[in-house]
Design a protein with these regions (language model features):
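N-terminal membrane topogenesis motif
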Residues: 1-27, 78-81, 85
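Hydrophobic/aromatic positions within or immediately flanking transmembrane alpha-helices
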Residues: 18, 45-48, 88, 149, ...
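Transmembrane helix-loop junction
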Residues: 37, 41, 71-75, 107, ...
């Protein structure tokens, strides 16, 4: 009887994770399609250039802690608060160092390209807010991904509306570059 209860909880937990991903992918597809058409190849390429650096450095910024955190949360649920705090502090440090590294590389590679530097700087700030994703692993370990999914979905819905508003208002590429950072910032605020 206990096994079926656990399986049901695990299935619900997985369902929330899948639903969140599907929502995120559907919104991303629609909004990115509109954004790409609006920005054009040059500016959309610039945003993707910034995204490339950020994606590469994300592996350094996260420190590979996800599986370790899940295991630690399951092994020591009472110490979860300390674990979350320590992991967030570690990730804030590594994220800040990663963002600074990105800026140093881009400054060396793209000398004099002020727009490129600005877009990359705005986009790479998202690494700092990604440190708060650590809380999501705590929810996953407790089979309560519903709350983490709601937090990240609220953030992404807000950012999707923000991007559509930017399209309507005719804003430039800098405004789109910061949208990724706003996505993670809103999720971090909702998590806290």
């Amino acid at each position: 009887m206990k096994v079926s209860f656990f399986s049901r909880r695990a299935a619900k937990n997985a369902g929330w994770l899948v639903a969140g991903r599907v929502l995120h992918m559907a919104l991303a597809f629609l909004v990115n399609l509109l954004t790409a058409r609006y920005l054009g190849p040059s500016n959309y390429g610039l945003v993707n250039y910034a995204a490339l650096y950020t994606a590469f450095f994300t592996s350094f910024a996260t420190l590979g802690l996800s599986s370790l955190l899940l295991k630690d949360f399951m092994d020591d649920p009472e110490g979860a608060g300390t674990t979350v705090g320590t992991a967030i502090a570690m990730r804030l440090l590594s994220s800040t160092l990663s963002a600074v590294s990105i800026l140093a590389i881009v400054a060396a590679v793209d000398r004099g390209e002020r727009l490129t530097m600005t877009v990359v700087a705005l986009y790479s700030m998202s690494l700092i807010f990604q440190a708060f994703d650590t809380i999501q692993y705590w929810f996953q370990s407790r089979l309560e991904s519903k709350y983490a999914t709601i937090a990240t979905s609220v953030g992404y819905i807000i950012v999707s509306f923000y991007k559509v508003l930017l399209l309507v208002l005719g804003k430039d590429v800098r405004w789109f570059a910061i949208s990724n950072t706003i996505d993670y910032a809103v999720a971090a605020i909702v998590f806290l």
